[in-house]
Amino acid sequence: MKENIDKLLSNIAIMEPPLGLQDKLALARQENRKLTIKLGFDPTAPDLHLGHAVVLQKLKDFQDEGHRIVVIIGDFTAGIGDPTGRNKLRPPLTPEQINKNSQTYINQLAKVINIENIEIRKNSEWFNNMPFSNVIKLISKITLAQIMHRDDFKTRFESKAPVHLHEIIYPILQGYDSVMIDADIELGGTDQLFNNLVGRTLQEAYEKKGQIVITMPLLEGLDGIEKMSKSKNNYIGLTDNANDMYGKVMSIPDSVIINYLTLATDMEAEKQSAIVSQLELGLNPMKIKKDIAYNIVKRYHDDISAKEATEHFERVVQKRTPEEADHDVLILPKGSYITLLDLCSVALPAISRSELRRLIRSGAVRVDKSKEDDEIKNIEVIPGTLIWIGKRYKFRIGS
């Protein structure tokens, strides 16, 4: 069970309460039942993006462990507009927009999770016909002081910007979804922490067991600064074509490479760690970005599309000839020395060191056309030096 917990805890930003997952898992075993895992979306835009996929991947982790997955489509609350992170009123959507976006969301969920064994609920089920007396009863469970703890409301209030009453009740309505489905755990981005904690408070107010709140880090957008968002036009959509998806990943700043590696790819943790180590040793960030871009395109399209997108990027964007494209560039400290094994490991971080040793000892590694079979030999870092590893991999030390 420890390995399963490690997987479920991987990459999370905040869990409230801190040991809540372990307690919920123990309770589920005691009661011989699955946990109910909730993830909610307001269909405010037609496309999901890689930022949404960070949370969807965590949902898949729980799905893989056999738990009950409930996705809430906030078709009712989308008509209000989530004020999270807003410094002004979010415009509500029309019923037509909401219905259209809801369907595209459901289709796109299948790119990350298995939609055959999840429950999809719309919160209009319980809100459309809720008597007004029940609305009053619901909002009486939360105080204005609690609501005003939200940073976005507090900022707007202090700057005398308007805060509308329908925005104030939004977190309460979203939280009530957890009451209706008896959620054990709610997932979301860190920007949803307040809303999700309201759900926990409401469950307890209705004499139910409070849900655990797990939030995931927010993936930076293409600018490398603000969170990925369609409204900021800094996003990579799950439905982007392969060439656009690849090119957008290649455009990210070097400062967010590791976040994209850990949050947006489905590489094994061991491979991710190896790449991070090699990046620290001086592997060209361009090489890392290509690995990330390839993985992401393969994940949301297929392997052939990823290969074609790579070729398109090198031919059209980098304007490299086929011969130049054969040699990836390694950036290492000029004039320094590095062992042959470390050099090969920097060049090919995804290949294990034991496999690289085998290649070296078998005579499959050449440095400037000279066969090298001593893994501990120190190689001087000289710009322009060519390295061949096997028949497939060719590298050039950059200046």
UniProtKB/Swiss-Prot annotation:
Output the GO biological process annotations, alphabetical, semicolon-separated: tyrosyl-tRNA aminoacylation
Q: Which InterPro entries does the record cross-reference, listed alphabetically?
A: aa-tRNA-synth_I_CS (IPR001412), aa-tRNA-synth_Ic (IPR002305), Rossmann-like_a/b/a_fold (IPR014729), S4_RNA-bd (IPR002942), S4_RNA-bd_sf (IPR036986), Tyr-tRNA-ligase (IPR002307), Tyr-tRNA-ligase_bac-type (IPR024088), Tyr-tRNA-ligase_bac_2 (IPR024108)
- What coarse category fits the chief subcellular location reported for this protein? cytoplasm
What residue intervals hold the motif 'KMSKS' region?
Answer: 227-231
Stretches assigned to the S4 RNA-binding domain: 338-398
Where it sits in the cell: the answer is: Cytoplasm
| Leading EC class | ligase
| EC number assigned by the record | 6.1.1.1
- What reaction does this enzyme carry out catalytically? tRNA(Tyr) + L-tyrosine + ATP = L-tyrosyl-tRNA(Tyr) + AMP + diphosphate + H(+)
Q: Which Pfam families match?
A: S4 (PF01479), tRNA-synt_1b (PF00579)
Tell me the domain of life: Bacteria
Sequence motif 'HIGH' region, residues:
43-52
Instruction: Please name the GO terms that the record assigns under molecular function.
Output: ATP binding; RNA binding; tyrosine-tRNA ligase activity
Which UniProt keywords are given for this protein, alphabetically ordered? Answer: Aminoacyl-tRNA synthetase, ATP-binding, Cytoplasm, Ligase, Nucleotide-binding, Protein biosynthesis, RNA-binding
NCBIfam families reported in the protein's UniProt record? tyrS
The record describes the protein's role as: Catalyzes the attachment of tyrosine to tRNA(Tyr) in a two-step reaction: tyrosine is first activated by ATP to form Tyr-AMP and then transferred to the acceptor end of tRNA(Tyr).
- Quaternary structure and interacting proteins, as annotated: Homodimer.
Give the UniProt family note. Belongs to the class-I aminoacyl-tRNA synthetase family. TyrS type 2 subfamily.
Name of the protein in its database record: Tyrosine--tRNA ligase 2
- What organism, scientifically named, is this protein from? Photorhabdus laumondii subsp. laumondii (strain DSM 15139 / CIP 105565 / TT01)
Top-level taxonomy: Bacteria, Pseudomonadati, Pseudomonadota, Gammaproteobacteria, Enterobacterales
Gene of this entry? tyrS2
